[in-house]
Amino acid sequence: MASIDEGSRVERRFCAVGNHTLRKPYRQLNNKYLVRFACLLNSEIRAGNLICCKCYTDLVRLYRKKNDNAKRHKMARETAASITDVSGSQSSSHQSAPSLHVSGQSSEFGASYSEGGIVTPDEELCSHRSLSQDSDNVPTTSAAAIQKRQLARANLMVKPSQRLSLAQTTPDCDDYDPNSNLSLNAVNGTRLPHIQPIPKRRPTVLDKQSMDIYLMGTTGG
């Protein structure tokens, strides 16, 4: 009678993984990694639950397969990251090399240009002074030449950015027009179409009688 009760009690047990009754041989699920993986199949599995040996073997096989796939994906990600880092470092080195080449060329160009003779503001000022001294040594009686010389001296005393050319300051150049600032009305008597002429003032009548008549007509009495 006791054996019959024990057999019926064993038949009512279920495997912790599947929906079938527990079959012999069976064992307890104590590995924490397998328990964590088995919780993906059944969230109610706990450590120490009974499981069929065949189900345990299948669970271990699936866990190892999943672990191998995870390792393979991790290695692929690390390889892709290393390739990206190498390509980024190569591109940065390629970009830095032309910049160094260009800077070297610019420095060489600056050195050669300075050796070839670059005109500094001091040299330009000295050249202007020498030219002005040469022109001062030449005797002249022209008022335009004297004014031009004075403007050249004043131009040397200011900053290079504020200096004006002699063509803009001297009035004796070929492009100078004494009537350039005059309007058309002053030059040839013409006017623009939107500007009406100013009417002339009516002459004042000195005759008192005529003035009274005029005021009576304008003021009404």
Swiss-Prot record:
Q: Which organism is it from?
A: Drosophila melanogaster (Fruit fly)
Q: What is the role of this chain?
A: Part of the HipHop-HOAP complex that recruits the MTV complex to form the terminin telomere-capping complex, which binds to chromosome ends in a sequence-independent manner and prevents telomere fusion.
Where is the sequence biased in composition, kind Low complexity? 86-103
Entry keyword set: Chromosome, Nucleus, Telomere
Q: Where in the cell is it found?
A: Nucleus; Chromosome; Chromosome, Telomere
- Please tell me where this protein is predominantly located: nucleus
GO BP, one example? CENP-A containing chromatin assembly
How it assembles, according to the record, is:
Component of the HipHop-HOAP telomere-capping complex, composed of at least HipHop and cav/HOAP, and may include Su(var)205/HP1; HipHop and cav/HOAP, but not Su(var)205, are interdependent for their protein stability. Interacts (via N-terminus) with cav/HOAP and Su(var)205/HP1. The HipHop-HOAP complex recruits the MTV complex, consisting of moi/modigliani, tea and ver/verrocchio, to telomeres to form the terminin telomere-capping complex.
Which cellular components does GO assign to this protein?
A: chromosome, telomeric region; nucleus
Q: What is this protein called?
A: HP1-HOAP-interacting protein
Q: Where is this region: Disordered?
A: 69-113
